[in-house]
Amino acid sequence: MIKIEKLTQSYCLNDINCTLPSGKLIGIMGANGAGKSTLLKTISGILPLKQGEIWFDNQPLSKMNSTEKSQHIAYLAQNTQIHWDLSVYDVIALGLATPLPKEKERSKIQTFSEKFAVTHLLDKPFQQLSGGEKARV
């Protein structure tokens, strides 16, 4: 579960409060400049918290070290300079917050791939995916 309390960040996020249940796929929608990316970057720990707190399973983000964060968070920006020659597996591995030992990496990527129904694509070159498949990855 992710719980956001009184999150204020920059000019675009003001007193955000919500609870996101575990195991659910959540969409964040809004106009350009509404703060979608700022919210995701703050949740993922890329941007430091200015005000408020984010909790992962009752553990505050502000108290987590990078290893603990990597157990809860992965972030891959939508528009990046993806290495087109990489497999889907490798692209997902790039999104991990910190490098993991190979066995833990495999396990985490397997879990993600099952959750987003892309397991059958793991060995496929990223450049060969359809638009919808790329979006899920």
Where are the regions that the model predicts?
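Conserved catalytic motifs of ABC-family nucleotide-binding domains
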Residues: 63, 79-93, 98-103, 125
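Helix-to-loop junction immediately C-terminal to a conserved catalytic motif
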Residues: 44
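Conserved ABC ATPase "signature" region
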Residues: 106-121
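The feature captures the beta-strand-to-loop junction immediately N-terminal to the Walker
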Residues: 29-31
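Conserved ABC transporter NBD signature motif
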Residues: 52-60, 69
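Conserved beta-strand
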Residues: 4-7, 11-24, 52
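Conserved Walker
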Residues: 37-38
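Conserved ABC ATPase signature
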Residues: 125-129, 133
